[in-house]
Every structure is written in structure tokens, then in C-alpha cells.
UniProtKB/Swiss-Prot annotation:
This is Sulfur carrier protein FdhD. It is found in: Cytoplasm. The lineage of its organism: Bacteria, Pseudomonadati, Pseudomonadota, Gammaproteobacteria, Enterobacterales. Required for formate dehydrogenase (FDH) activity. Acts as a sulfur carrier protein that transfers sulfur from IscS to the molybdenum cofactor prior to its insertion into FDH. InterPro entries: Cytidine_deaminase-like, FdhD.
């Protein structure tokens, strides 16, 4: 399998996922100049030769994305269910070819659904409303987080957003330990993709104690993905939706929104928060 490493802050000359383009800057006078824009390309996830989904994503950390998506969608239960990941750039996008174990591929074929172009919609391609909610084993109560350490994590979040710092155009997802130290993270133009990338990286790291921190709002799908990968606490910089709160309550996940320096809103299972 492709090696997955935690993201690091890079110089602008090294940054993947951003390009400079000619623009016309308008203030009082029109002035031609160059500006950085985040890249957004179609990425097809292909399992054992069969295309499963095409999503718009920033073309970096794609092996982590493939692993995290496979885990958070319940296609696999552990990284060992994937034998290989191969990334193939093409003229119209990127193919990520994932070789599944025969048992997992058989399961995928049974539940396979047509899902195309899902950048922010978890309902696309689902035939029945009941299929929106995947069965999730209720999380145990083994984690705790002191909100005094949240400020430390928030101050470090931009470290995993080199493209975002250049363009102002990406979401971030990071894993923070109970002391608020940011252990690793990812960015993407899509908030769900950024989270999947993080979950893929976490699956290859010994990170158990801690929480997920995202720079976006918390939708039901963000909650579902987090819980599917066994994380017990999700901090969102913005708000949560009503459905996100319902799903978090049901699966025993502690959901925290409006995570800002010195304050936060705890929506569900506050016993994990000190």
C-alpha cells in the first residue's frame, strides 16, 4: 500500500494542490497580477477495477483519502483489507485504484450504489431514506478532553493548511491529543474529503487518545464518518446541524460546535468534556 505520512507545513514552492494564475485585481485601478488558487479535480475511486464514486478533491494525500473513505463508508473495517493503492493521473482527472480483499469486495458489490460528484452531499445516489444512516456500533466512553487545551489546538490548525494559507480556499481536519497538541491533519476544498484524508492518516498512526478538529460546520455525514472510525469527540469550528446532533446522540459521539478560543458549544454527551 502507498505509504501515508502526516501532512506538514511546506514552503509555497513545494506546495501541491495550488497553482498560480493570472488575474485582474480590482481596487481603485485594475492591475494584472498572479494569484494562488486551490486545485479542484475529479478523483475516481476504483475498487478492484470497478468505479465506485467520483468526487471533487484537491490532488494531494489521495492515498490517505482512499483509505479514510473506505473506512468511514464501511467498505473496509481495517487497513489490512486493502492490498494496494495506485494513483493514476489522467487528462480529465485522477484515478485511485484500490485493491480490496475478495471478502470486502464481495460485500461492496452487494451494497454498491451509484454515487457521482459527491462534494458536499451524502444523499446523492441513495435510493431510500433509510439507507442514509449506516449502522454504527455505539461508541464507548473512554475519552475525555479539557476545553482549556482547545485554544492550543485551534492556534495550530493552519499548520496543516499550506494551500489554505495561500488561497483561503480549503477546509482542514486534524487529530489533536488530550493536551491540545496537533498530531497531524489534512486539507481539501471539500470538508468531507479533508476528514476522510485525516481518518486515513490516523488509521496508520498510533493515535488513540484525542479528538477530531475540523475547520468547517458539522453535518450528519461528518459525525457518521467520525464515529465509523471510532473517534469519540468531534470539534467543529462552525455550527452543527440538527441531523448531526441526532446522529451524534444516537452513536454516543460528543459533538462540539462553535469551537473558538475560550468558548465552545457542547451538543451531545458532555460527560467527556472537562
Amino acid at each position: 500500500m502507498s505509504q501515508i505520512k502526516p501532512s506538514r507545513l511546506s514552503s509555497s514552492a513545494e506546495i501541491r494542490g495550488a497553482r498560480q494564475l493570472d488575474v485582474l485585481q480590482r481596487h481603485k485601478l485594475a492591475e494584472p497580477q498572479q494569484d494562488w488558487l486551490a486545485e479542484e479535480v475529479p478523483v475516481a475511486l476504483v475498487y478492484n477495477g470497478i468505479s465506485h464514486v467520483v468526487m471533487m478533491a484537491t490532488p494531494k494525500d489521495l492515498a490517505a483519502f482512499a483509505l479514510g473513505f473506505s473506512l468511514s463508508e464501511g467498505i473496509i473495517s481495517s487497513p489490512q483489507d486493502i492490498y494496494a493503492i495506485e494513483i493514476t493521473p489522467g487528462c480529465n482527472g485522477i484515478e485511485v485504484n484500490i485493491e480490496l480483499s475478495s471478502r470486502r469486495f464481495a460485500g461492496l458489490k452487494e451494497r454498491r450504489r451509484a454515487m457521482a460528484g459527491r462534494t458536499g452531499c451524502g444523499v446523492c445516489g441513495i435510493e431510500q431514506l433509510d439507507d442514509i444512516f449506516r449502522p454504527i456500533t455505539p461508541l464507548p466512553f473512554t475519552q475525555a478532553f479539557n476545553l482549556e487545551h482547545l485554544d492550543t489546538a485551534l492556534a495550530q490548525l493552519k499548520q496543516v493548511q499550506p494551500v489554505g494559507q495561500l488561497t483561503g480556499c480549503t477546509h482542514a481536519a486534524a487529530w489533536i491529543n488530550p493536551e491540545g497538541e496537533l498530531l497531524g491533519g489534512c486539507e481539501d476544498v471539500g470538508r468531507h474529503v479533508a476528514l476522510d484524508k485525516l481518518l486515513g492518516i490516523r488509521a496508520k498512526q498510533p493515535w488513540q487518545q484525542g479528538a477530531v478538529l475540523v475547520s468547517s460546520r458539522a453535518s450528519y455525514e461528518m459525525v457518521q464518518k467520525t464515529a465509523m472510525c471510532g473517534a469519540e469527540i468531534l470539534f467543529a469550528v462552525s455550527a452543527a446541524t440538527t441531523l448531526a446532533v441526532e446522529v451524534a446522540e444516537r452513536c454516543n459521539l460528543t459533538l462540539v460546535g462553535f469551537s473558538k478560543p475560550g468558548r465552545a458549544t457542547v451538543y451531545t454527551h458532555p460527560q467527556r468534556i472537562k
